[in-house]
Design a protein with these regions (language model features):
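Hydrophobic transmembrane helix bundles of membrane-integrated enzymes that assemble
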Residues: 1-251, 318-434
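Short, charged juxtamembrane terminal tails flanking transmembrane helices
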Residues: 435-440
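Long extracytoplasmic/lumenal interhelical loops at the membrane interface
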Residues: 259-263, 267-278, 282-333
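Intrinsically disordered, low-complexity segments enriched in polar/charged residues with Gly/Pro
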Residues: 253-254, 314
Length: 440
């Protein structure tokens, strides 16, 4: 039976799909966060005993402060400034909302995963998620990558929670990843493939029993992964795989170099990095336009080798690309915002990895998926993910880590109590032997 918390989380996540124009597009859920969390949730937090939440709050506050400083120095327009700052504010409020309702009710992670899936089914993909390469691939590839793949991944995660005792589920998840790669959804497939393999290694601890075994396991995984990658490239070059973004293979001088293919597939991130280096200290401001055409030329050079065009062809409505949450922070607001964002991402990645071995079996695949997906999203997904999908990963990782830490502390207390009881029993027996002659 659905309780109030479950219904609230379902409706809240679905509310991100209902948008209207208010100094840019804003959803019902974001407007709800701006009112509900500061008035209802934040006053209820027991900050004196919430050291982790204080660290996260401080990191977000520092990021927001550097963003405000950057926007002031750059002299950015008010609408763009408000849009950039709103993403950070909503990200923090989204995280706090989920942590508040998931605390003590880890089972609501299932409702959260289902809500993510339902949102994709009802509202589809956000156009901001699509890079220029994605649009150029056509409707079929975009439909697979931004609609079908996320739905299948969320459905699989939900099933892994329900049927967690089925020990071969991680391998099935890896097979799903291989299928998605072949069909053209390389990033979604790669995340699923890596998630399944890592989860399988964790569940079969013989692979992680010592450092030598762990190193050997990673070498084997890298070798197998590259062998599959080389086979995929050879089939694309032979014309046997033509789906999705396979055209990018032909743009590479050496397609068997995965880094070169990554540059072709995520050229906006590399261009964004160059834009970051051009204005290293305080960035270009939120959502800056490429008025000189410099970054448009770089994009064309990386996509099809055509690196020159006339000034009349420059689009003054072309935003400087980044397609990376982390790089985008530096490109927009400079190195201090970049480091602040990097700290936030690294903090949750570290907590997630620390929870791998102690996580409840029911949520092990989910945890590994969100950790790997968080890393990929931070590196190669647009800035809008910081307000919507990344707080979900933050909250899931935080709750699972807190639960594992609590279980460890409870186990330590039980062990201490048992040792004390055993010590008292031995002490009593010794005392009885020593005083036996007195009683007799």
């Amino acid at each position: 039976m659905l309780d109030k918390r479950t219904i609230l989380i379902l409706l809240f996540e679905l509310g991100f799909g209902l948008k209207f124009n208010l100094v840019g597009m804003i959803s019902i859920s974001e407007l709800f966060l701006l009112i509900f969390v500061p008035l209802y949730i934040l006053p209820k937090v027991k900050w004196s005993g919430a050291s982790s939440l204080k660290t996260i709050t401080a990191a977000y506050s520092i990021l927001l402060s550097f963003q405000i400083l950057s926007e002031f120095i750059v002299g950015n327009g008010l609408p763009s400034t408000l849009k950039g700052l709103a993403i950070t504010v909503v990200s923090y409020l989204h995280f706090m909302f989920l942590v508040y309702f998931l605390s003590g009710r880890k089972s609501l992670i299932l409702a959260l995963v289902i809500a993510q899936m339902a949102g994709k089914i009802i509202f589809g993909a956000d156009i901001e998620e699509q890079s220029i390469e994605d649009v150029m691939q056509g409707e079929g590839a975009t439909y697979l990558k931004f609609y079908i793949s996320p739905i299948i991944a969320s459905l699989s995660l939900a099933l892994s929670i329900i049927f967690f005792r089925y020990k071969h589920f991680p391998l099935l998840f890896s097979l799903l990843g291989i299928a998605l790669i072949v069909l053209g959804a390389r990033s979604s497939g790669g995340i699923a493939l890596a998630t399944g393999l890592v989860t399988y290694m964790i569940e079969h601890r013989v692979f992680t029993y010592n450092r030598k075994a762990l190193a050997l396991s990673f070498i084997i995984i890298i070798a197998v992964s590259y062998s599959f990658y080389a086979y995929y490239v050879s089939r694309v070059l032979a014309g046997e795989i033509t789906s999705g973004n396979s055209r990018q293979v032909f743009l590479c001088n050496n397609p068997y170099n995965p880094l070169e293919l990554l540059m072709a597939g995520r050229s906006e991130a590399w261009v964004g990095w160059q834009a970051f280096m051009d204005k290293f200290w305080f960035g270009h401001g939120a959502w800056p336009y490429d008025s000189t055409g410099r970054y448009q030329r770089m994009m064309l050079a990386m996509q099809d080798g055509f690196s020159t065009f006339t000034r009349s062809q420059i689009s003054y409505h072309f935003l400087i690309p980044s397609h990376s949450v982390l790089i985008g922070s530096g490109m927009m607001n400079g190195v201090f915002a970049f480091l602040s964002m990097g700290f936030i991402v690294f903090y949750f990645l570290k907590k997630g990895v620390q929870s791998f071995m102690r996580c409840d079996d029911r949520y092990k695949l989910v945890l590994v998926y969100y950790v790997i997906n968080l890393l990929w999203t931070a590196m190669f997904s647009p800035q809008s993910h910081f307000r919507q999908s990344m707080p979900v990963a933050f909250a899931v990782i935080f709750i699972i880590y807190a639960s594992a830490a609590k279980d460890k502390a409870d186990e330590a207390r039980r062990t201490t109590a048992l040792r004390y009881a055993a010590f008292q029993a031995v002490k009593d027996r010794v005392l009885q032997r020593k005083t036996r002659h007195i009683r007799s």
